[in-house]
UniProtKB/Swiss-Prot annotation:
It comes from Buthus occitanus tunetanus (Common European scorpion). Negative results: has no toxicity on mice (ICV injection) and tumor cell lines. This is RK1 peptide. Belongs to the disintegrin-like family. Expressed by the venom gland.
Length: 14
């Protein structure tokens, strides 16, 4: 997952 753009998932929040 590319959290630099799609930071709206549980993976990026953790």
């Amino acid at each position: 997952i590319d959290c630099s753009k799609v930071n709206l998932t549980a993976e990026c929040s953790s």
